[in-house]
UniProtKB/Swiss-Prot annotation:
Species of origin: Streptococcus pneumoniae serotype 4 (strain ATCC BAA-334 / TIGR4)
Gene: purC
Reaction catalysed by this enzyme: 5-amino-1-(5-phospho-D-ribosyl)imidazole-4-carboxylate + L-aspartate + ATP = (2S)-2-[5-amino-1-(5-phospho-beta-D-ribosyl)imidazole-4-carboxamido]succinate + ADP + phosphate + 2 H(+)
An annotated Gene Ontology molecular function: ATP binding
Similarity comment: family membership: Belongs to the SAICAR synthetase family.
Coiled-coil region(s): none
Pathway annotation from the record: Purine metabolism; IMP biosynthesis via de novo pathway; 5-amino-1-(5-phospho-D-ribosyl)imidazole-4-carboxamide from 5-amino-1-(5-phospho-D-ribosyl)imidazole-4-carboxylate: step 1/2
Taxonomic classification: Bacteria, Bacillati, Bacillota, Bacilli, Lactobacillales
Superkingdom of the organism of origin: Bacteria
Protein name per its UniProtKB record: Phosphoribosylaminoimidazole-succinocarboxamide synthase
A Pfam entry, by short name: SAICAR_synt
């Protein structure tokens, strides 16, 4: 498959393929936090992220969620449908943690009666600001129906993920999703799902996600390896 680099991000490089509707996503060993302020090369991270994300996306596809995932090509590569990314980070919170706890001055780990969906404007220059539905419409990112769909689909994905992670003894605290328009203009789930973009706690409250890197709590790949081993119990 001939390929040309079209985008280099913090965690992945994106390449063209011979099919204009398909891309190759190559996962890097780079770990970043605080919008790239903290950065480190961690051997083996790319392989683990690709394994975990490929596994989750395959399960989501089977469950009827429309995603960009086609297949895992190698240890670090996967084949994806090409999408026009919607410049929103869609965050769902099942428990208080991270920026939510800081913003509202509350402890981490409080269960939310109803999961909260938040939007963040994907713009590195502006540090990905927290925005509401009216901002989304003002910026002409999405209209009312699209906003409603993004929230509904995120909540549906959450119900699936919560069950899967509970089965392997992990609590899904929160996560970030990205969506895009496919070649037919349909909104589908894109990007990845790994401990890079979610918070997972074990029964003892230990962090099993990128907070290990953010907060200097241990070796990132050790934690990701445990998550990957647990996920394979779902097969």
């Amino acid at each position: 498959m001939s390929k040309q680099l079209i985008y280099s991000g913090k965690a992945k490089d994106i390449y063209t393929t011979e099919d204009e509707n398909l891309i190759i996503s190559t996962y890097k060993d780079q770990a970043t936090a605080f919008n790239g302020v903290k950065k480190e090369q961690i051997a083996g991270k790319g392989v683990l992220n690709n394994q975990i994300s490929s596994f989750i996306f395959e399960k989501l596809n089977v469950a009827g969620v429309a995603t960009h995932f086609v297949e895992k090509l190698s240890d670090t590569e996967q084949l994806n449908k090409k999408v026009k990314i919607i410049p929103l980070e869609v965050v769902l919170r099942n428990y208080t943690a991270g920026s939510f706890s800081k913003r509202f001055g509350v402890d981490e780990g409080i269960a939310l009666e109803t999961p909260i969906v938040e939007f963040y404007y994907k713009n590195d220059d502006l540090d990905d600001p927290f925005i509401n539905d009216e901002h989304v419409k003002f910026l002409q990112i999405a209209g009312d129906q699209q906003i409603a769909y993004l929230k509904e689909e995120t909540r549906r994905i959450n119900e699936l993920l919560k069950v899967w992670f509970a089965e392997i003894g992990l609590k899904l605290i929160d996560f970030k999703l990205e969506f895009g328009f496919d070649k037919d203009g349909k909104i589908i789930l894109a990007d990845e799902f790994s401990p890079d973009n979610c918070r997972l706690w074990d029964a003892d409250g230990n962090h099993m996600d990128k907070d290990v890197f953010r907060r200097g709590l241990g070796e990132l790949t050790d934690v990701y390896e445990i998550v990957w081993e647990k996920l394979q119990e779902l097969k």
